[in-house]
């Protein structure tokens, strides 16, 4: 797992696991019915992470689905205990960027969605560590599930100030392009969930996927491409450079793309 959130395949392209997968158990059986953008993974969390999970997950996290039942609408005001702009991050990975950006904007509530329990456990532990600091983080909530499912069922039209999708799996082989997260249907769904003036911020280090994202984003009539340094954006688009990126500075260039929801 990279520290900016991408989880890499280990071995051949993965079929459905033959035994329960502790990292995706309870998440992906339903999604065998449609093409998904995530891969099956096997991973464990430490005893310390498990203890933190047991203590904080009931308050800060929730499972998107209970079996085959679709999730219901999410009341973010009740969950966060306040009314504030909401940003949805799809595929938060280990939460390095999630935490840093939430700390920089305490007035914005961040809902971080991730399929893999290990990544969520790392983010939950990082949030817990801020409790002993001068500025404990209280504006992050976590959902374990599929991002498209969460967008479809848990958020209504014009309910989001922003959507972040950082380093989604590029699925580089042509026969797997249909598995890419940012497809025309997903772009249309994101556009519907953004309020007018809300923004979609995407980042990838795969140039082929960057071109694909740019094409499908520009083709969505309710989204207008804007520059990263545009004034009056409703949320920060200053994304922290992670350890993974620092190690890869001589490698692939990171492409960042930004769209604004039209009135």
Curated annotation (Swiss-Prot):
The EC number(s) this enzyme carries: 2.1.1.33
Reaction(s) the record says it catalyses: guanosine(46) in tRNA + S-adenosyl-L-methionine = N(7)-methylguanosine(46) in tRNA + S-adenosyl-L-homocysteine
Catalytic-site annotation from UniProt: 169
Chain segments carrying region Disordered: 1-33
GO cellular component: tRNA methyltransferase complex
PROSITE patterns named among the record's database cross-references: SAM_MT_TRMB
SUPFAM superfamilies: S-adenosyl-L-methionine-dependent methyltransferases
Family annotation (InterPro entries): SAM-dependent_MTases_sf, tRNA_(Gua-N-7)_MeTrfase_Trmb, tRNA_methyltr_TrmB_bact
Pathway info: tRNA modification; N(7)-methylguanine-tRNA biosynthesis
Any one GO molecular-function label of the UniProt entry: tRNA (guanine(46)-N7)-methyltransferase activity
Alphabetic keyword roster: Methyltransferase, S-adenosyl-L-methionine, Transferase, tRNA processing
Residues where S-adenosyl-L-methionine binds: 89, 114, 146, 169
Binding, substrate: 173, 205, 242-245
Family indicated by similarity: Belongs to the class I-like SAM-binding methyltransferase superfamily. TrmB family.
Function summary: Catalyzes the formation of N(7)-methylguanine at position 46 (m7G46) in tRNA.
UniProt protein name: tRNA (guanine-N(7)-)-methyltransferase
Native source organism of the sequence: Mycolicibacterium gilvum (strain PYR-GCK)
Lineage summary: Bacteria, Bacillati, Actinomycetota, Actinomycetes, Mycobacteriales
């Amino acid at each position: 797992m990279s520290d900016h959130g991408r989880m890499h395949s280990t071995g051949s392209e993965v079929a459905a696991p033959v035994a329960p997968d502790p990292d995706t158990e309870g998440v992906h059986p339903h999604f065998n019915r449609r093409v998904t953008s995530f891969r099956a993974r096997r991973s464990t969390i430490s005893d310390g992470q498990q203890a933190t999970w047991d203590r904080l997950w009931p308050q800060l996290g929730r499972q998107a689905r209970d079996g085959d039942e679709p999730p219901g609408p999410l009341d973010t005001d009740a969950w966060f205990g306040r009314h504030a702009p909401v940003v949805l991050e799809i595929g938060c990975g280990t939460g390095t960027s999630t935490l840093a950006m939430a700390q920089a904007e305490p007035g914005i509530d961040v809902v971080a969605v991730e399929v893999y329990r290990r990544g969520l456990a790392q983010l939950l532990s990082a949030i817990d560590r801020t409790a002993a600091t001068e500025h404990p983080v209280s504006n992050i909530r976590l959902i374990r599930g599929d991002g498209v499912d969460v967008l479809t069922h848990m958020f209504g039209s014009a309910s989001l100030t922003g959507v972040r999708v950082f380093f989604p799996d590029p699925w580089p082989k042509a026969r797997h392009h249909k598995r890419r997260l940012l497809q025309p249907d997903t772009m249309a769904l994101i556009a519907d969930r953004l309020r007018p003036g809300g923004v979609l911020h995407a980042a990838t280090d795969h140039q082929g996927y960057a071109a694909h994202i740019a094409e499908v984003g520009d083709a969505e009539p309710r989204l207008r491409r804007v520059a990263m340094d545009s004034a009056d954006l409703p949320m920060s688009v200053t994304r922290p450079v992670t350890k993974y990126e620092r190690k890869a500075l001589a490698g692939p260039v990171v492409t960042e793309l930004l769209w604004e929801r039209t009135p």
